[in-house]
């Protein structure tokens, strides 16, 4: 005999107020993405939310988890080439599975992970694997689908003010540049292109691997290309506006080497 369960979530709440975002966060799992013919494996962190109407006490949390699991199970090795070709396509696949399991008007899926890219060192031309924090979000409301892509890139800056007033000597510091692009789902925007826009805007990029000639090259480049954090933010913004459609947000933080505080520059377009 089939056991009957009480659907507490379907009951009316004492306080009848609609909630625009209810769901799960900090869920870690595995994902496989086929990007330009290569299969990448990620251990991403998911956040998935839907709207909750005023007459419902709660949402069915397990159905949200099932939607992620179903989308993951499709991406077996022999089939991954046919489906998830980007993190945003994976996020949309989760929403599509959720539509089969749970009624809602609005759904969001956010995926945070680390993207590892191959770079060549500037002088010795050796291979270096560089990590970048990235986040992708897909929001579906009715027939409208938007996506947001975010990248966080580490570079460095050399202070032009100290250089101008100290016979060419200056202080340098690590800087963190963030770029966020929000646009229609079908617009072509890649995380790799966004990373390149940010990384090329610093005094110099940073590298995981540096041999002595590479270290010398990075130092020379910094001193030949001094920039305020404001310069970096403006350069990222103008490059991003030319390259990417949609709304753009730029944030740069300089971890100051001669101060006890940091410096920030931020802009929107």
Curated annotation (Swiss-Prot):
Cofactor note (record) = Binds 1 Fe(2+) ion per subunit.
HAMAP family listed in its UniProt record: GTP_cyclohydrol_A
NCBIfam families reported in the protein's UniProt record = PRK13675.1-1
Cofactor field: Fe(2+)
Q: Which GO terms describe its molecular function?
A: GTP cyclohydrolase I activity; GTP cyclohydrolase IV activity; iron ion binding
Its EC number(s): 3.5.4.39
User: Which Gene3D superfamilies does this UniProt record tie to the protein?
Assistant: Urate Oxidase
Q: Name one Pfam family in it.
A: GCHY-1
Q: What is this protein called?
A: GTP cyclohydrolase MptA
The protein's site described by May be catalytically important is found at: 159
Recorded catalytic reaction(s): these are: GTP + H2O = 7,8-dihydroneopterin 2',3'-cyclic phosphate + formate + diphosphate + H(+)
